[in-house]
Amino acid sequence: MKCKLKLVSSLEKVFFNECTGVNEITSGSMLSNEVYSFQLVCYVETTRLQTRFLSKIKVESELEPFIQVKQVDYVPSLVPAYVGDMDNEYLLTQPGLIPDPLKPVQDGVIVLAGNQSRSFWITVEPKNVKPGIYDIRLKISNYEDEFLAETSFKLEIIEAELPKLPIYNTGWMHGDCIAKLHDVEIGTDRYWDILEKYLRVYVKFGHNMILTPLFTPPLDTIPGGERPTNQLVTVRINQGRYVFEFDKLKKWIDLCRRCGITYFEMSHLFTQWGAKHAPKIMATIDGEYKRIFGWETDALSEEYRLFLQKFLGKLVDFLKAEEIMEDCFFHVSDEPKACDEEQYRKEKEILLSYVKDSQIIDALSNYSFYEKGIVATPIVSCDHLQPFLENGVQGLWTYY
């Protein structure tokens, strides 16, 4: 059994082959407040009829207290590319396994595979470390601690700090998914504790804006279907009058600020891909908690319009009292099509009575919506950027 090692960039995707086409690295540099990552690739040559080899990895370095090792695992990709609509840069065009999840290594124990590559994600996150060049030595042994191979990496820590991110960086962190994964009920103390941990990691990886579920976000949901209720605004209907309570929204804002969030992306007021319906909104009516709007609601119905007018006025008052109104962004509906232009205009007019045009952001692939001034701040799908770039759109956002 022979173990061959190779150090590669964190940007590389390491598949099962011998990794011969991937450039090797031996050194790197980082600013004092950055996190630096690279990969160690282990390829086992063997004639033994054995697919798994329990082994061990050991880190030797002055930086060892600040180094984490994770094993790169694989997940199936059934449609990695659309045939007829792809360039030559795809790493995988047929169904197969691709590297993605990172699994923490416990007590240095790792799993290698016979005649295949396995990669390990090395993360360096120094705290109060003097600037300089540090050697990181990585040793591989079998489970009985017999030496197999070793290599080393030189990391320079530069006496300077990465400045605060000068752009907006948001992501859709869905509370219902977190609740399901951890088998907790949304809104419980346990849920809020788990949510805080996710938020801190979210900020650590460069996000400064967060999707805020005023009502259950109408996102990635089949028509007629609904996501688990995740609603920060409490709605009551007393004798035909709407009452709005923002206690949970304040708790959310306070938590997000404490974790380092600066900007708030308010959830969409209309459904995706056409803006034809209202999002799922729950309310308590005479003691009964029930859905009052959803897929059955025409987005331009008088009932929903009146609700929005009552709600938006109270929401804006609350956000101003919290002194974050200028740090908030609002959605009408994502990805409207040309045939949705009139519908979108009417819905946006409702919102414009309460917020600035520049605070309204929506995912957009149709350049004509921007050209006509319908969407002032488009968030463009990265595969539809070209016309926006060619026409010199300033302050352009993008998503993928």
Kindly give the residue locations of the regions a language model identified.
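Extracellular glycoside hydrolase catalytic/binding regions
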Residues: 357-385
